[in-house]
Regions:
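Catalytic Walker B motif of ABC-type/P-loop ATPase nucleotide-binding domains
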Residues: 169-172
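Conserved ABC ATPase signature
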Residues: 144-148, 152-154
Length: 246
C-alpha cells in the first residue's frame, strides 16, 4: 500500500552546552498502510525525535513531512500549513500511544477515551464504548486509571488514540511498562489495525516488538543504517536483541 505518512530529508539539531548536536541528519521514512513499522536504535539515536517530527508534534529544522489527505486527495505538505491547520490534521489523521499512558487520573476510562473525540456531540460515548469493547475493556469503562493494571491503562490509551478513526497510529515504547502477557495483547491489537489498512509506527527497544513488525528501520547517530525501505523484521531481530543487551 502507499505511504500514509512520509518524511523527506528531515534534519533536527539542538544546542547543548554551547555546542550544536545533530539529532537527525536528512532522514527519509515512509510509513505505509497495512504495515507495522518498527523504529529501533540505542538511546539517543533520534528515534523519539523522529516520531515527534513525523507526528507533527515538533517541527524539523530541515526537510518536509507529508500526510495523506482525506478521501484519497493525495499527500499534504505539512510545511505549508498554518499552526491551526497543522493541529487539525494531527488530531484527525494521527493517533498517539505513549509509554506513560497519559491518562487523566480523575476521569474514568470511558471519559479518557471520549475527551479527544471530534465528531458530533452525543456520538462520542458510543464510539468510546465500542473501542473499549474492542480492546477487551467493556466491563472496565467506568473505572478510574488507578483501578486498572498497566496493561489495561495502555489499552485505554490505544482506544483513545483510535477515537477519531485515524489512518495512522504512532506509538513510542508502548510496551515499556508492560508484562509479557499484556505486551502480547497490545501487539495483537496493533497487528489488527495494520490488517485493516492502517499504518502503524512503533518506536522500541524491545526485540519482541520489532519482531512483530513487518519492516524495521534502525537509527544510529541520526541516520538510518538499514536500507531506505527498511528490512524485514526477521532479519533485524538479532540486531535489536544485541542493542537491548548493551
Amino acid at each position: 500500500m502507499s505511504a500514509l505518512l512520509r518524511a523527506e530529508g528531515v534534519g533536527k539539531s539542538y544546542t547543548l552546552r554551547g555546542r550544536r548536536v545533530d539529532v537527525l541528519c536528512g532522514v527519509d521514512l515512509a510509513v505505509r498502510g497495512g504495515e507495522v513499522t518498527a523504529l529501533v536504535g540505542h538511546s539517543g539515536s533520534g528515534k523519539t525525535t523522529l516520531l515527534h517530527i513525523i507526528g507533527l508534534l515538533t517541527p524539523p529544522d530541515s526537510g518536509r513531512v507529508f500526510v495523506e489527505g482525506t478521501d484519497g486527495t493525495g499527500p499534504v505538505d505539512t510545511s505549508e500549513l498554518s499552526d491551526g491547520a497543522l493541529a487539525d490534521l494531527r488530531r484527525s489523521r494521527l493517533g498517539f500511544v505513549f509509554q506513560s499512558y497519559n491518562l487523566l487520573p480523575q476521569h474514568s476510562a470511558l471519559r479518557n477515551v471520549v475527551l479527544p473525540f471530534l465528531g458530533r456531540r452525543g456520538e462520542g460515548e458510543a464510539r468510546a464504548r465500542a473501542l473499549l469493547g474492542r480492546v477487551g475493556l467493556a466491563e472496565r469503562a467506568d473505572h478510574l486509571p488507578s483501578e486498572l493494571s498497566g496493561g489495561e491503562q495502555q489499552r485505554v490509551a490505544l482506544a483513545r488514540a483510535l477515537v477519531n478513526d485515524p489512518p495512522v497510529v504512532l506509538a513510542d515504547e508502548p510496551t515499556g511498562n508492560l508484562d509479557t502477557e499484556s505486551e502480547e495483547v497490545l501487539l495483537g491489537l496493533f497487528r489488527e489495525l495494520a490488517d485493516e489498512g492502517r499504518a502503524v509506527l512503533l518506536v522500541t527497544h524491545n526485540p519482541a516488538v520489532s519482531d512483530a513488525a513487518d519492516v524495521v528501520h534502525r537509527l544510529d547517530k541520526g541516520a538510518f543504517t538499514s536500507p531506505a525501505e527498511g528490512v524485514p523484521a526477521e532479519n533485524a531481530a538479532e540486531r535489536v536483541e544485541t542493542e537491548s543487551a548493551e
